[in-house]
A protein has these predicted regions:
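Peptidyl-prolyl cis-trans isomerase
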Residues: 1-163
Length: 163
């Protein structure tokens, strides 16, 4: 029944919001990497020398990032002119993510090693999350899901001999 479902959703939302009362902002800061989004470009190469050459060519505007990615990148981003995203900051390789966290839009990074690749990245745009009602709901639902799983595991362990 629709009325029962709406009542259930309302109660669930109220419980979720009450769970984050008082700790919402610290929870927000803890999960900020999952809430913020970035749009960036990447070129992956197996040759360090070629990576350096392409980096300097992009930096001096001899070639655009998109042209370089299309022509030289050895990953799937060669089909998108290097574009990746928008993605949260937990999605990219940690070496890439750490640079994107502190980058300014249009900032080009010198080649660095990420796994087997020599990687060139440039942040295009950062979509900053805000601590608003939508974010509070997301965090509350996350916490409620975690608490529900914890309670479920506790009950299973307590009554496993009876199941």
């Amino acid at each position: 029944n629709l009325a029962e479902f709406a009542h259930y959703q309302l109660k669930k939302d109220q419980v979720a919001l009450s769970l984050i009362a008082g700790t919402g902002e610290s929870l927000y800061l803890r999960y900020k990497d999952r809430l913020d989004r970035v749009l960036y470009r990447i070129i992956r190469l197996s040759s360090e020398d070629l990576a350096q050459h392409i980096y300097y060519s992009i930096e001096s505007a001899e070639i655009t990032f998109g042209e370089a990615a299309r022509e030289y990148s050895e990953g799937p981003e060669s089909k998108t002119e290097g574009f990746v995203g928008p993605v949260d900051l937990t999605t990219p390789h940690p070496e890439i993510s750490s640079r994107l966290k502190t980058a300014n839009p249009s900032q080009l990074f010198e080649p660095f090693k990420a796994e087997q690749w020599f990687t060139i990245i440039r942040l295009e745009y950062r979509f900053e999350s805000e601590f608003n009602d939508q974010t509070k709901k997301f965090l509350g639902d996350l916490l409620l899901g975690s608490k529900s799983n914890s309670i479920k595991e506790s009950l299973i362990n307590k009554y496993k001999d009876y199941i």
